[in-house]
UniProtKB/Swiss-Prot annotation:
GO terms for biological process: embryo development ending in seed dormancy; glucosinolate catabolic process; nitrile biosynthetic process; seed dormancy process; seed germination. One of its GO terms (molecular function) is lyase activity. Fe(2+) binds at residues 387, 391, 395. It comes from the Eukaryota. This is Thiohydroximate-O-sulfate sulfur/sulfate-lyase (nitrile-forming) NSP2. Its EC number is 4.8.1.5. Disruption phenotype: No visible phenotype. Reduced simple nitrile levels in favor of isothiocyanates in tissues corresponding to its main basal expression. Abnormal accumulation of glucosinolate in seeds, during stratification and germination. The keyword Ligase does not apply. Kelch repeats lie at residues 178-226, 231-277, 281-330, 332-379, 381-435, 446-471. The gene is NSP2.
Amino acid sequence: MVQKVEARGGEIGDVWDDGAYDGVRKVYVGQGEDGIAFVKFEYVNGSQEVVGDERGKKTLLGAEEFEVDPDDYIVYVEGYHEKVFGVTTKEIISTLTFKTYKGKTSPPFGIVSGTKFVLQGGKIVGFHGRSTDVLHSLGAYISSPATPKLRGKWIKVEQKGEGPGPRCSHDIAQVGNKIFSFGGELTPNQPIDKHLYVFDLETRTWSISPATGDVPNLSCLGVRMVSIGSSLYVFGGRDASRKYNGFYSFDTTKNEWKLLTPVEQGPTPRSFHSMTADENNVYVFGGVSATVRLKTLDAYNIVDHKWVQCSTPGGSCSVRGGAGLEVVQGKVWVVYGFNGCEVDDVHCYDPAQDKWTQVETFGEKPCARSVFASAVVGKHILVFGGEIAMDPKAHEGPGQLSGGTFALDTETLKWEKLDKLGEEEETPSIRGWSASTTGTIDGKKGLVMFGGKAQTNDRFGDLFFYGVDSA
């Protein structure tokens, strides 16, 4: 489906329309005295190349070129328009920047000045607008795939046995038909225990796992845990005096802990970081050290038993804690987080190229937040809840918390809100600082969420599952 998005900018000048094609291959932009004087686009239509007309008037400054790779396409145009006063007042486009799906970004053509506008929503396949001897406005044709909305449902999972009880700032991971929980607090900044709890999905019963080997020496909060195969991997977290844990594995078949990296030998000790894994690597991103917030990404290969520090994201990705971190189709995604305030940007790391890309998303975007629940189903990243404003007492207080279930399609870069009218009673209460993992319950894959901090500053001890019916 191709949608014509109205032109943004001024309302004077001759109307022009290039139409819609299969994609945009080249962009030419010429600057003038006051802003963008000239644009021209080359398109691809099947096996044919279509060259659009020159829009505006080329000046002695010439034109700059932005080329799109054959296996890529433009998904985002950022521009600015402003009024220029002279013999007559006219509104012109002062700046244009183009970004592709794979992260290739043009330089900003022109001088950033005026009112910002954005053209996005899918694959951009054509342009239209108004011009005289300058460019007054720009719109686009955008192709959006007719993909079905992700469908699912929240259920509250029955719990029996000796469980973790109410807590937040802990983590969970699933191995087979068991969910494991480790760390956390009931009272702010006071870790509860260092038991490893195990929930049997067949009997819906909690118990404390027997533990041998190098049992972690600290009860901790702000800890992170992931699973690969039959093993759990636990990194970081702190106690009340801000001592930190190292990096451990737990063999769920032997109930045996192993210290893989002492705290002084691995990545910077931290808490409230983010962790995820693929088949061979554990990834650790960001978090809060004893002195500063971080934005480094470290990878531990479980075959080589070695840590590698990946490239550090550029300036567009700020230091942060409480971000979502997920692996989707081989790439590592950083979603939102807290850098002194809540942020709503998304970044993607490609391990094969050791390269970061800031991703521009659209749709029913959740507002800026951190310490939310997250999971991956297919190409979608699911999120629920989180903190949307820090408490004046920092971690001692609840902050302003949120609810809402959202999905980010990592191919179209579109957010959708999944909550349905009439099903509010089945949706978990608003919360943040909960533990979450991608899990499978009763044959469905989805988001498993346990505990968290309530708006009253109490702690939850409930277990919820958002099972996906279709994607």
